[in-house]
Amino acid sequence: MKPYPFSAIVGHDRLRLALLLCAVRPEIGGALIRGEKGTAKSTAVRGLAALLSVATGSTETGLVELPLGATEDRVVGSLDLQRVMRDGEHAFSPGLLARAHGGVLYVDEVNLLHDHLVDILLDAAAMGRVHVERDGISHSHEARFVLIGTMNPEEGELRPQLLDRFGLTVDVQASRDIDVRVQVIRRRMAYEADPDAFVARYADADAELAHRIAAARATVDDVVLGDNELRRIAALCAAFDVDGMRADLVVARTAAAHAAWRGVRTVEEQDIRAAAELALPHRRRRDPFDDHGIDRDQLDEALALASVDPEPEPDPPGGGQSANEPASQPNSRSKSTEPGAPSSMGDDPPRPASPRLRSSPRPSAPPSKIFRTRALRVPGVGTGAPGRRSRARNASGSVVAAAEVSDPDAHGLHLFATLLAAGERAFGAGPLRPWPDDVRRAIREGREGNLVIFVVDASGSMAARDRMAAVSGATLSLLRDAYQRRDKVAVITFRQHEATLLLSPTSSAHIAGRRLARFSTGGKTPLAEGLLAARALIIREKVRDRARRPLVVVLTDGRATAGPDPLGRSRTAAAGLVAEGAAAVVVDCETSYVRLGLAAQLARQLGAPVVRLEQLHADYLVHAVRGVA
């Protein structure tokens, strides 16, 4: 079936513009599209690939999709097994990056892709080449492609270190306008009823877009980006307080691409504005609880400030310019194929400080107190070591060594080491024929994350609201750190006769803030149900990611009162958590004068430390969780 025409997409003007600008100038660094399900993200990317094939006049140019389960050797390439086994030759087999050369590399749900693969993709997109040093191979080849990633923020954030590497970002959502939604339905149903007729109806519009892409690609290097425009871009990025210089370069390249797309040869303010709206939103976000996007009023103010000429420096004492000094020449416009590059290698003269924007009001704070936490540090390297900043032996990381078949740390076949062993045994004897003794397995290292599950007593036996305020603050604080890594946090509450999954495992602070804003309290204490729900969640998440280590934080007084034999069932449920290998922390919420010590008994059954209710400040709880990690 032919792809849905790009020109037939209803609305999403900013999304379409971002994709077109990336097609005009791939050096921008690609685009990240964030949005809820069913917002034409994938449809737009496939339509762009079809346009690019026409614009470049290449039948080989097209769309290459990178599946989430792809391995590093499939992405960058590896040993050509067929030629090695048949001819005994040491040959390279290209990967997906080589196939994407000249076209579009599309990664759906890029936030769920392994971090080291995202690093490889972004490096290749920025450099335009792939360097392979693995399996005894040293190889380099061109890989110039338009990198497009899509993601649903509800499924977790992309680490800021990786987010900054994408040139442009666009947030999309379905229109709430009834007429627009009706038009979307009509066009989609017409396409599904007769794809060929529908594509033919928009063929002329798509052909015009392809022609504009080709024309812009041919002229973008000739677009003039003058000194005044460069100063305006630099002042704009400084005003928004972005880190590093990547934002300045991306805005400059995008502004030039936008000017070429409009068919003009000089970058103007409207080009800089369009570029800033696409290149700055994800770079100015400093906190996981900040809103996405960029404030138009702030952008207008920044552009206005950037347009003001700096005040001239006062003449030095003793007079002005001497008679024999040449008169200063006005700034001249010059072509630049690398916008934002310095004009000289010498020391820059002192310049007035860039104006800062007035602070915009922050959105209302999430429930409870949010605070900064220390990063999780786990000493040593070994199986199960948690934390995305901690190296750990696992079955899905990068290959770091080879081992004998009997090594328990090895996972899967290490192809090159196996062939090397066979070659050493039968050197010069023709085609390789590995024997069982030649087989080597791969030792992999990756970065593992935690799954922190808060199991909270929301019954009416004591101050449930105070407990939830503390757990809300601790959860959001852990998510602040999870924003830097890929830790996940979940919250289970139990009251009356059941347990409720209040917050599904997430690393999205936005989702957590909304879900933790409301909760119900009161009723009996079904402790066993809460522990059983935590175990069920751990089992379910292990199917998705076996490397993620579960940590359970139980906030209760231990006074189970719901159901038959509540204390006995609680002990059985605790034993089930231990059997799943979950580490735990118990927060003793008992406040009565006569203490029964039931929470301490539960802690002994879980093999967990105990934190007193009097110590239940959110930052203390966070440090307790990190202590058992």
Curated annotation (Swiss-Prot):
Record domain VWFA: where: 451-587
Key words, A-Z: Acetylation
Organism domain of life: Bacteria
Biased amino acid composition, Polar residues: 322-334
InterPro entries given in the database record: AAA+_ATPase, ATPase_dyneun-rel_AAA, BchD/ChlD_VWA, ChlI/MoxR_AAA_lid, Mg-chelatase_DI-like, P-loop_NTPase, VWF_A, vWFA_dom_sf
Pfam family, one: VWA_2
GO molecular function terms listed in the Swiss-Prot or TrEMBL record: ATP binding; ATP hydrolysis activity
Record-listed N-acetylmethionine modification sites: 1
Region (Disordered): 308-395
Transmembrane regions: none
Protein family according to the UniProt entry: Belongs to the Mg-chelatase subunits D/I family.
Protein name: Uncharacterized protein Rv2850c
Natural source organism: Mycobacterium tuberculosis (strain ATCC 25618 / H37Rv)
